[in-house]
Amino acid sequence: MQWETVIGLEIHAQLATQSKIFSGSPTAFGAAPNTQASLVDLAMPGTLPVLNEEAVRMACLFGLAIDARIDRQNVFARKNYFYPDLPKGYQTSQMDHPIVGKGHLDITLEDGTTRRIGITRAHLEEDAGKSLHEDFQGMSGIDLNRAGTPLLEIVSEPDIRSAKEAVAYVKAIHALVRYLGICDGNMAEGSLRCDCNVSVRPKGQAEFGTRAEIKNVNSFRFIEKAINHEIQRQIELIEDGGKVVQETRLYDPNKDETRSMRGKEEANDYRYFPCPDLLPVIIEPEYLAKLREQLPELPVQKRERFESQYGLSAYDASVLSASREMADYFEKVQEICGDAKLAANWVMVELGSLLNKDGLEIEQSPVSAEQLGGMILRIKDNTISGKIAKMVFEAMANGEGSADQIIEAKGLKQVTDSGAIEKMLDEVLTANAEQVEQYRAADEAKRGKMFGFFVGQAMKASKGKANPQQVNELLKKKLEA
């Protein structure tokens, strides 16, 4: 039997506000436990929440970016459940009247095709605290620094059909919230977390299968692995005569498996009701019109512009527009050197390799856009060859200065004097007289391979400084003379 996978994702994006959603407590990551929790966060009697206007602004920006309906009136609700790190015994969230309604996001897949994923809603809510188990013997500690941190929960339609599509969608959301400046997207710190709802059904069946939810997956790689494992688990279970149970599961990356955590709750299990401490939020059209003017160029728009303005391939444009910082870096390099394709190649290949090796983000690059753009200029004006440029790039990464300073200090300037190159080539050909005779006696196919030998000897003799184009042209003339 052929099976079809149905996936819906719930992404929790921690909003980049300076204070919590209902109190003035700071939201900085990594503070000592319970040093960023106020009386409101601790749910002390008599305290009342005050809504953070910046969180509302950020949610509205997101709604505008996904072309969603933004309700004029939205209401906060209490989601009731007990957990040790939830001081109030309920979470303030939104249920029937979320701030952001139906929208969509277009994603680009590995084969270059585009798919539109529907977004059901996005609502504001507060985060819970954190239970600490490993530092205590026979008990657990509670850190309430995170309690009350503003979250935007983004709920997709069940439009995703594979683990790879799921990763592409999460990457698109990740890029979007960073472009908007509403979330730093740091998955290692929990700023962006994903719950994956997975079910399978016989291909062609309209009715959905029973879904399982995989909670709090916090990396692109783990999202793909967790979903693929869950798909396989459900198919094997059904084919063996069993039934999929609606439940919440956890992904264990060490064992590459999902395991049952608890039965999956429905909305009525949480006994939602409007929060009596918070008035409905009214969002006027004039407010949204002003916000729309603040929208930056979004990832899809930037990618399309990179293709049309700079003539980049769809793949290159996609990589370079993946983050706002990467796009800004590339455009600065391009502005300096005036060659978009050379700039794209150096940013994606050499710089990308350096950043990956050292585990750095583009904003932490040891080579500035000004330095890289200046170096590419020296390739274009034939001051250095592409091969020497790699040496210059490495020196810049080691903090040895600008391209011009390094070229001067190390004597790396390319030899472009035809007379000097001809003299050097004569010496190379004299030293390899036997190979010269073999070349002249060979057919065209063999000559192509042998020519590379002479080029290599010439570049070796010049220590890589001879202009490669001149070497090729002059060498060909001499060998065919």
Curated annotation (Swiss-Prot):
EC number: 6.3.5.-
Organism domain of life: Bacteria
Name of one Pfam family that matches: GatB_Yqey
Molecular function (Gene Ontology), one example: ATP binding
Keywords noted in UniProt: ATP-binding, Ligase, Nucleotide-binding, Protein biosynthesis
EC primary class: ligase
GO annotation, biological process: glutaminyl-tRNAGln biosynthesis via transamidation; translation
Keyword flag Lipid metabolism: no
Gene3D superfamilies documented for this protein: 1.10.10.410, GatB domain, N-terminal subdomain
Matching InterPro entries: Asn/Gln-tRNA_amidoTrfase_suB/E, Asn/Gln-tRNA_Trfase_suB/E_cat, Asn/Gln_amidotransferase, Asn/Gln_tRNA_amidoTrase-B-like, GatB, GatB_C_1, GatB_Yqey_C_2, Gln-tRNA_amidoTrfase_suB_CS
Catalytic activity: L-glutamyl-tRNA(Gln) + L-glutamine + ATP + H2O = L-glutaminyl-tRNA(Gln) + L-glutamate + ADP + phosphate + H(+); L-aspartyl-tRNA(Asn) + L-glutamine + ATP + H2O = L-asparaginyl-tRNA(Asn) + L-glutamate + ADP + phosphate + 2 H(+)
Similarity-based family: Belongs to the GatB/GatE family. GatB subfamily.
PANTHER family: GLUTAMYL-TRNA GLN AMIDOTRANSFERASE SUBUNIT B MITOCHONDRIAL AND PROKARYOTIC PET112-RELATED, GLUTAMYL-TRNA(GLN) AMIDOTRANSFERASE SUBUNIT B, MITOCHONDRIAL
Subunit-level organization: Heterotrimer of A, B and C subunits.
UniProt-listed NCBIfam families: gatB (TIGR00133), PRK05477.1-2 (NF004012), PRK05477.1-4 (NF004014), PRK05477.1-5 (NF004015)
Function per UniProt: Allows the formation of correctly charged Asn-tRNA(Asn) or Gln-tRNA(Gln) through the transamidation of misacylated Asp-tRNA(Asn) or Glu-tRNA(Gln) in organisms which lack either or both of asparaginyl-tRNA or glutaminyl-tRNA synthetases. The reaction takes place in the presence of glutamine and ATP through an activated phospho-Asp-tRNA(Asn) or phospho-Glu-tRNA(Gln).
Protein name per Swiss-Prot or TrEMBL: Aspartyl/glutamyl-tRNA(Asn/Gln) amidotransferase subunit B
Organism the protein comes from: Pseudomonas paraeruginosa (strain DSM 24068 / PA7)
Gene behind the chain: gatB
